[in-house]
Swiss-Prot record:
Belongs to the archaeal FAD synthase family. GO terms for biological process: FAD biosynthetic process; FMN metabolic process. It holds the Pfam family CTP_transf_like. This is FAD synthase. HAMAP family: FAD_synth_arch. GO terms for molecular function: ATP binding; FMN adenylyltransferase activity.
Amino acid sequence: MEKKIAVTAGTFDLLHPGHFNTLNFAKKHADELVVIIARDETVKKIKGRSPVIPEEQRKIMIEALKPVDRAVLGSLTNKLEPILEIRPDVIVLGPDQTTYQINELKAQLAEHSLYPEILKVEDYVKCPFHSSYDILKEIVRRWCCKELKV
């Protein structure tokens, strides 16, 4: 019997409970979890800023997490490329993905005769720092005008 493979993707810059929630959710739906790490250049284009942590280091950190079996860097030219190479049975999307984005992804994958189950994490993890951006803002608030004591 073949292993059921799940894929999820993201920047995974400053890790927070939402990342762990998504990874654990994805692993519950498959035997093997492959995580696609967004490239630094791609993040800068989409978010208007580079990640704090470089892509290779983010990949190493994600690979070290318990639910993750393997991490790969995304493509610089075609966001579907790693998905088409992995050919997962399940794709897990975060809670911030819209129905339009999900339907668009299904259509794009169908063009390549790929029909994975697409699952969306519905619940946000409620905590003070539930996004990498919130963590970064808090670091700046606490430390930008103070002398760092090492």
